[in-house]
From Swiss-Prot:
<dbReference type="InterPro" id="IPR013083">
    <property type="entry name" value="Znf_RING/FYVE/PHD"/>
</dbReference>
<dbReference type="GO" id="GO:0070696">
    <property type="term" value="F:transmembrane receptor protein serine/threonine kinase binding"/>
</dbReference>
<feature type="repeat" description="ARM 3">
    <location>
        <begin position="338"/>
        <end position="378"/>
    </location>
</feature>
<comment type="subunit">
    <text>Binds to SD16, SD17, SD18 and SD129.</text>
</comment>
<dbReference type="InterPro" id="IPR000225">
    <property type="entry name" value="Armadillo"/>
</dbReference>
<comment type="function">
    <text>Functions as an E3 ubiquitin ligase.</text>
</comment>
<feature type="repeat" description="ARM 2">
    <location>
        <begin position="297"/>
        <end position="336"/>
    </location>
</feature>
<dbReference type="GO" id="GO:0004842">
    <property type="term" value="F:ubiquitin-protein transferase activity"/>
</dbReference>
<dbReference type="InterPro" id="IPR011989">
    <property type="entry name" value="ARM-like"/>
</dbReference>
<dbReference type="InterPro" id="IPR016024">
    <property type="entry name" value="ARM-type_fold"/>
</dbReference>
<feature type="repeat" description="ARM 5">
    <location>
        <begin position="418"/>
        <end position="468"/>
    </location>
</feature>
<feature type="repeat" description="ARM 4">
    <location>
        <begin position="380"/>
        <end position="417"/>
    </location>
</feature>
<dbReference type="GO" id="GO:0016567">
    <property type="term" value="P:protein ubiquitination"/>
</dbReference>
<comment type="pathway">
    <text>Protein modification; protein ubiquitination.</text>
</comment>
<keyword id="KW-0677">Repeat</keyword>
<dbReference type="Pfam" id="PF04564">
    <property type="entry name" value="U-box"/>
</dbReference>
<feature type="region of interest" description="Disordered">
    <location>
        <begin position="1"/>
        <end position="34"/>
    </location>
</feature>
Amino acid sequence: MGKNGRLRWNPFSHRSSSSTSSSSRQQQQEQQPPVEFLCPISKSVMSDPVVVSSGQTFERVCVQVCRDLNFIPKLNDDEESLPDFSNIIPNLNMKSTIDTWCDTVGVSRPQPPDYSTVERILRQQMPPPDVEIRVSEQELLRAVAHRAPMIIHHADSELMGRRDFNNSTTSSDESVIVAHSPFTPLPLTTRPACFSPSPSSSSSEIETLTHHTFFSNSTSTATEEDEVIYNKLKSSEIFDQEQGLIMMRKMTRTNDEARVSLCSPRILSLLKNMIVSRYSLVQTNALASLVNLSLDKKNKLTIVRLGFVPILIDVLKSGSREAQEHAAGTIFSLSLEDDNKMPIGVLGALQPLLHALRAAESDRTRHDSALALYHLTLNQTNRSKLVRLGAVPALFSMVRSGESASRALLVICNLACCSEGRSAMLDANAVAILVGKLREEWTEEPTEARSSSSARENCVAALFALSHESLRFKGLAKEARAVEVLKEVEERGTERAREKAKKILQLMRERVPEDDEEDGEGSIDWDRVIDSNGSIRSRFRVGGRNRVVTQNSSGF
């Protein structure tokens, strides 16, 4: 108060109050947990986070309650985001991050939610008892059933044309077939190399039963044989288990009805235990039966959801040679289903498949591992994950050495569709390696023309992908003397290879400004240059000194 008894205004007192409130709000915001720390069901910070088969992370208690209630909650009112609780893996990285955050902000670490509380939350989301609305596994299977003919047609044609491969020894390159289409290379193979429609000479399969013993009369006979197999599989006698598995293996080799009827939860639960059996004959026949069951589209989702993938990964890592063949074949067969691609990648199959492709003793294991990786990397998440696992240097090492080069090129073409893959490839000297491989392919003997054609197409497709969205490509291509090789491909290659080579050469001539003529005559119709299928969509306007270049590329 001043001399005159009047109050004086102090501006600093107001500023201090405002600063204090702002600091308080900032502190409150810092204590708000990140959204990824919250369980989508309980909406609270997770104390024991687990990753489910569909890739999401939940509180363990919430997953258990959902299983007990046989209920699949919707996430954000999105039908496509329905979680899959068939298998869980502890998310240790998330748990460690949450604990660190709690210690940093000075709050207590989260405790598991009460079971009854979670149950009450979920029951509020469940429809009334009199309303028959529930998303079940069978409904999910029916929802994708209409897509089956696309795969079945390829399977039928491929099996008829390549049946000899399953019963004879072929070169590694001959076993990889690429579709003759302008799209991304797609192997027509839909049957694992370990699968044979006729009785095999495998030591694990005893030829004591004729090929047409079962399902020859009626559906009632099928039911009777199902019961016989079930009773043998659940027997405590190893001999009975072996006989039951041999019967099952033979029944499911060619009979579609047998594959569907025997892919039941009670038989699959017994089969899962036998895959980890210490008796090699039991394990191998169980895996062979699973391969046969997985050939039916309806069974692919069921097998993954019942938790077979982690077991197959373990067998692929440390099983016998024949067991590894069947494990790789099953994973390949399961990966043909789009809804299985992400769960298989999340469950950790990519690294073991890559190792099997490089180092497996069996050619069949390497073959099916390559095709499994090819189909899994059609998924963007798996592509990025495989790049982070260091797959690019390993794959190009195989191309350079010539070991399973065509198989490695299939995966490389998919990885080139993502920016991480292209960057890693350029760092791994991919342009020089691919150009060198193209040079080698022109010197192959005529007997190897089929494999050379496939390898050339994949090399050119990979170079075509690298030529986009990369300022480094042109310099690297010139250094590798790619122009002369690409001109050779343009003149003598297959139709698909010629088209790609022509586009790469045009991109190299016209893409960089310093290569333009000073007077700039006319313009180029780039819509005619780029793929008619739209897999690479780029538009350029070239004219005069001022050239406008706009690009919107989405892979190849």
